[in-house]
Amino acid sequence: MKLITTLPLLALLSGVAFAQQTTDNSCRPDGLYQTPGINVPYCTVYDATGREIISPDHPRRIIGYFTSWRHGKNGQPAYLASDIPWDKITHINYAFAHVNSANQISVGDVTASNNAATGMEWPGVAGAELDPNLPYRGHFNLLQKYKQQYPHVKTLISVGGWAETGGYFDSNGDRVASGGFYSMTTNSDLSINNQGINTFADSAVAFIRQYGFDGVDIDYEYPTSMNDAGNPDDFALANSLRGGLMRSYIELMKVLRQKLDAAGAADGKHYLLTIASPSSGYLLRGMEAFQVTQYLDYVNIMSYDLHGAWNQFVGHNAALFDTGMDAELAAWNYYNTTQYQNIGYLNTDWACHYFRGTMPAGRINIGIPYYSRGWKDVQGGNNGLWGTAALPNQNACPPGTGGSTVSKCGNGAVGIDNLWHDKNTQGGEMPAGSNPLWHTMNLAEGIVGSYAPVYGLDPANPEHQLTGTYSEHYDATAVAPWLWNAQKKVFLSVETEQSIAAKAQYVIENGIGGVMFWELAGDYGWNAANGEYFIGDTLTTQFYNSFRNASPYGAVKANRTMPTQAADIRLSISDFKLGDQNFPINPKLTLTNHSEGAIPGGASISFDVPTAIPDTISDQSGFGLTVIESGRNASGNNIGGLSSDFHRVRFNLPGYLSVASGESVTVTLNYHLPMPMPSNWILSANGADYAFAQEYPQLPVVAIGSGDGGPGDGDANGESCGGVTATIYPYPQWPQTDWQGLPSHAVGGDHLSYQGSVYKANWWTNSVPGSDGSWSFICNL
């Protein structure tokens, strides 16, 4: 096996890598990429700690999606910019713009009077009077008008979404299968469409300048290698490009970041770049190491749609925690597969810890659904929960569902239980149990809302009638409420003030940046005049009241003291297998030495990975890569949440292997659940610790062997070999004895040496030092 490769000192790595940066870092959030040579005005958005400046009563983000189609011109209730609780929120994502056939950002014909974004007017609607000084009308006019009154609120243009990732709707409402993000980023031979990406990025910059947005939010669903992921209308094109989607997605986000940085420097304001990210471990398995996070101001996790009528497994739409009882995971024998260590991944906490492995908590926002999902004719379960509801005729499954003996298509709730339904290509109702929360509140109270006729509910249709009783239930472990109609056997997964209170507290306690919700118009309030619930701001106000006195969010990636100097070592992760073949996950980690000195044989390299993966990560290259500090829950599962952020991982270069300047070393990794780019890298060599300049560009870069390592703890937890005062026993000379008085084990605090390194026992153990989570690496002898 060839372990060392030689590259020119300034060669670009193949695969994906961070870039070396030399520009001003004032106010830059920890871990955010900065375009080389551009002095980005971060301090217009962030304070000296890298935390976003919003307002004194908004220490956490409250981000609402505002949809273009609730304009009221179709006879259904309008939700306009004047209806937004501007004093309660911090960011508005306008949904959606799309990628047009010329690879440009677009909201359609901006000169048309019926264009909701730029052409519509609402005469006689209080608060919806347009600003006559702006050269456009529509939603964009009102958003700009209210932003002037509430300057703490930022607006972003969201591009894509489920329906418009691979195409767009024309002025007649017909979908144009233009290819959208897929063809804009990826050529048919799987190469990167650089021309398409640059065209789109240039148009995005021009767009936000023209309409006064503060950034771009990419809702690309989904650049994963998993077949048949995303909108079934896009499968034919997307499946043919799966092998190149992630590579081109990374390039898209890098180019957007660079062009937004350049525009920000020219305009004197920092522009935001964000995404709506999938949360399921299934989708993330096909997204490599999610190498786009470095380009994002923050990530909005779509921690909802975790269960729905696309299959028969009746469960929570947006559980906060795993319960060990998820019926979908159980059907695949997931909990009994030892490699996964009982880490359930269909919950918000798992997704949050996934991203925490590569980002500060404050650059993460969790998703909250202001809508329901549900099934009818549910069989079994506890008041429906974890029961099944398969469509009786499996030959009539909606596109993209069914076809599996394990995962059958579901029997989605319809009629009065599906107020906000989508339509299929024939114009028929898509069964999904999709409702705004104000409608589910009315169902729980036995109220037929006065709005029913404008949503097409016919009182003569039995499916549209209010029958049975909707009883409220709550899964305290999952933090998830639901409604159960025993007569109809209808299950609707919802959110209530009880679950919102728990999720708000979770955000506060874990230092998370805030929340994002889909969508503003789904929130509820009591309409006393009509005696019913309707569109309101109850839950949004609840988030505001919960957060207003919260502590600042977490602004640093590392939970340990990092070195105060850096070595110029650059890393990439590449060669992922595609789709279902990507198990176990075995990419190649490449480290390239761009330092002036060689990395000596025997040097230690350590890093953090998230507790969202098992603590069994290893390598296939003979480097002895192992977890030296396990963050695994003592319970052996993640029921009720993961208790730690990181596992600490380490490997040593063999004594004979020195990596000279310009050379690379490659290690093949081995793990079983997806993880993002590892973080908090430390090289320990020649008695000193070094961060990686690629990850910590603000640190002084020194030649390997020339520094003192600063006060960083490396992997020594504050100790060094010279500073260990306890007795160090050579393995297998155990310091503790069994009942016969024979050396047999170590207990917490005992130090043993093995293969040139010192380890400290975390608890009772008789395993090989450094072989599992019972040991903490201290230092190299």
Where are these regions (language model features)?
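Glycan-recognition patch characteristic of GH18 chitinases/ENGases
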Residues: Q20-I208, L346, T401-N442, V448-D458, ...
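Terminal connector regions
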Residues: G640, S644-H647, G655-S658, E663-G710
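Extracellular low-complexity, Gly/Ser/Thr-rich intrinsically disordered linkers
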Residues: R70-H71, A432-P552, S574, P587-T590, ...
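Substrate-binding surface in catalytic domains of secreted glycosidases
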Residues: Q104-L130, P223-M430
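Asparagine-centered strand-capping/turn motif at beta-strand->loop junctions
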Residues: T590-G597, V609-T611
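An active-site-proximal structural segment forming one wall of the substrate-binding cleft
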Residues: T186-D217, L252-A262, L284-Y298
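Short, solvent-exposed loop/turn segments enriched in Ser/Thr/Gly
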Residues: Q581-L589, G601
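Tryptophan-rich substrate-binding surfaces of secreted polymer-degrading and adhesive proteins
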Residues: G709-L781
